Amino acid sequence: MSEVDVPELLFERVWLQVDRDRDGFIYAKQMPSFITQCEQVIKDTVNTNKTDFHMTRFKNRLKLPLLPKLHMDLIDAFAKETPYYKIYKESFSDMLNKLTGNNFSTVINKIFEDCDGFPASFISALEVKADVKSSPRSKADSLGSPIKVDLLRNLKPQEEPETPRRINRKYKSLELQLESMKRELEDKEKTIMNNERNLTELRSTISKLKEKYDLLSEEYEQRHIHGGNNGTAIKHDVVIGELKSRLQEQNRLIRILQEQIQFDPQLKRETRVHDNKSKNNTFNGAIAYVIPFLLFIFVIRSLITKEDIGDATMALPWWERNNLASRLAWYFRDVFSNDSAKFLESDAYDKVFGIH
């Protein structure tokens, strides 16, 4: 490449076009235009001599545009957010480096990296135009006609910082936006709280269902392990123990009554002679105690065990498979049946209950 600093020549030329009043700085909103004008100057320069073979080959090897779309979007966003930020001539390259990761010289040199040097006509075009632009006499020419210069100067006051009224209006607009965002935040917080509450309820329900499932699974395993269709093998040991103790108590009372009848033959004969009222008075206490107990057994039994449907018609009732319960059931069935008087007179009745 040539020893001439092409990026510097290009920068000086475009800076004179953008900094029309020679303030030594440009605003951030002018930065996108600066990049665009740099690209346009390069295109115009290479097209000055279309018959030059070296210039044509140089043009075909250029890598335009200067910046990719992503970097231009970053510069546009910076210009819109801080339109009146002052970028001084000495700090322009650093600002470009902060936004795109490359300074001005690097950006310009990248588009020429495939070229075998700069054609002499290209360098001379940049130098001549730069000299013309730098002369005070040609300031109006660089901007176009004097009318254009006057129009741009007349528009200059509109580019000054915003008035207090506009600032106040923007402040109120920002306040409204802030209130709207606060309301949205509150709504989202309420939604989150409702979701958390629903989640807690669902977790509680799932926990209860899991406990029930575990209990049923364990009971099912116990039933199959300890007896198949025999419903006595159930987890509820406390209930079963209570039933056993009550059955033992009832068995004891029955033995006491049998001993009293066997001990006093006269009582046995009087029992046969007297009417049913005398017999009922003898066993009234036992009957009043046993009947609620039997009802309690049937209710508990129906709650804690159920027979399989398929075996219901083939298996005997549970109370018939238990000797003590079977004897009690048949005894009270005989006592309260219509033919109870006949059973009282029969020898079979005496034989069953051990009365001789």
Swiss-Prot record:
User: What does the UniProt record say this protein does?
Assistant: Component of the spindle pole body (SPB) required for insertion of the nascent SPB into the nuclear envelope and for the proper execution of spindle pole body (SPB) duplication.
Which Gene Ontology BP annotations are present?
A: protein localization to spindle pole body; spindle pole body duplication
**What start-end ranges are recorded for coiled-coil regions in this protein?**
165-264
Main location, first listed in the record: nucleus
Q: Name one GO cellular component term.
A: spindle pole body
**Protein localization:** Nucleus membrane; Cytoplasm, Cytoskeleton, Microtubule organizing center, Spindle pole body
Its membrane topology: Single-pass membrane protein
InterPro entries documented for this protein: Mps2
Q: Tell me what this protein is called.
A: Monopolar spindle protein 2
Residue ranges spanning the membrane: these are: 285-305
Q: Which family does it belong to?
A: Belongs to the MPS2 family.
Question: What keywords are assigned to this protein?
Answer: Coiled coil, Cytoplasm, Cytoskeleton, Membrane, Nucleus, Transmembrane, Transmembrane helix
Which domain of life, per UniProt? Eukaryota
